[in-house]
Amino acid sequence: MRHFCASAYIIDPETKKILLVKHKKLTRWVQPGGHIEPNEFPEEAAIREAYEETGIKIKLLGERFPREDDFIRPLGIQKNRTESGVHIDFIYPAIPLNHKELKISKESTNIGWFSREQLETINVFPDIKITMDYILKNYFNEVD
């Protein structure tokens, strides 16, 4: 079965920290995201999932495809195979629009902001570190 998903790498422009949720099933820290609903565009799903999983509203950062419908290009598309099928994830860099109290969704056990250095001390997939480095360098002019 094919699963189309969208996720947001939410980075605070002031602190350069990333917002991650600790996924209940995976028992790892991951970026907020989830399945794209029928009749929903990937960028809409990324915004919706971020709000559902964290309680904050976001603005996607990305190149806008020059068309009437104002399509935002994803930073990348991640693909992997699992027991439930093929997962295709549209990845978007984002910034928070509000910093109200974070909420933990039923799919997570924890939520938090992490610096790049802190990612070395928590259980994350290597892709999260690589993607955060890319976003910091290309969207926030952070040089390692």
Positions of PLM-derived features:
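Active-site segment of metal-dependent pyrophosphate-handling enzymes
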Residues: 55-100
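Compositionally biased, intrinsically disordered linkers/stalks adjacent to structured regions
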Residues: 133-144
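Short connector loops at helix/strand junctions that flank enzyme active sites
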Residues: 1-5, 24, 31, 83-89
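Conserved N-terminal beta-strand and adjoining loop/helix that marks the start
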Residues: 1-17
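Conserved Nudix-box catalytic region and its N-terminal flanking loop in Nudix hydrolases
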Residues: 16-59, 65
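NUDIX/MutT-family hydrolases
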Residues: 91-93, 102-132
